[in-house]
Amino acid sequence: HSCEICHNVGKSCEGSVEPCTSPEDQCGTVVLEFSPAPVSFRSIHKNCFSSSLCKLGSFDVNVGQNTYVRGRIQCCDEERCEEPQFSGHCASHPNGYYCPGIFGLFSLDSSANEAVCKGTETKCINIAGYRKEMYPGDIAYNIKGCISSCPELSLSNRTHEVDRNELIKVECTDAVKIPPSECQSSGI
């Protein structure tokens, strides 16, 4: 099985078609959006994916300070897949739950802020991994925040290859009802 492989900031990319290795048996396109404006940007990644990642479909992680990391995944059996579309993001109100929240690069365990969960977000997610690049090498990343339901993601056991994304941690826990800062004793 072969798929088009490319990565780009923006809404489109074109790359060469390369063979996939098991268990990554489907072609896919992932569009990531980091919002809100004025710093919102999108990136697109076309690659070989495992069917477990394809089932994820979409995710919206509230990383705090009214910022979201959103992803849309479209998989197909052809070498080149359609690009997934974003629907508008529904603004919702705080629901009383809290999670650690951060979008961190160059670290697998970034120190977190407090993310105020909204709407149906009652779970906390903690994802860490490496993005493989020719230059400057592996880039570590860590995303923590509120999410509506826990994704079924399996960890990668792949060897290090160029242009690959390697997940090394996916933790999903129940959000807490009170903000952690209120639990600390006032220094008397």
Swiss-Prot record:
Pfam families documented for this protein: PLA2_inh, UPAR_LY6
InterPro entries, per database record: CNF-like_PLA2_Inhibitor, LY6_UPA_recep-like, PLipase_A2-inh_b-type, PLipase_A2_inh_N, Snake_toxin-like_sf
GO cellular component terms given for this protein: extracellular region
Tissue: Expressed by the liver.
Domain of life (superkingdom): Eukaryota
Role this protein plays: Inhibits the enzymatic activity of phospholipase A2.
Protein name listed in UniProt: Phospholipase A2 inhibitor 31 kDa subunit
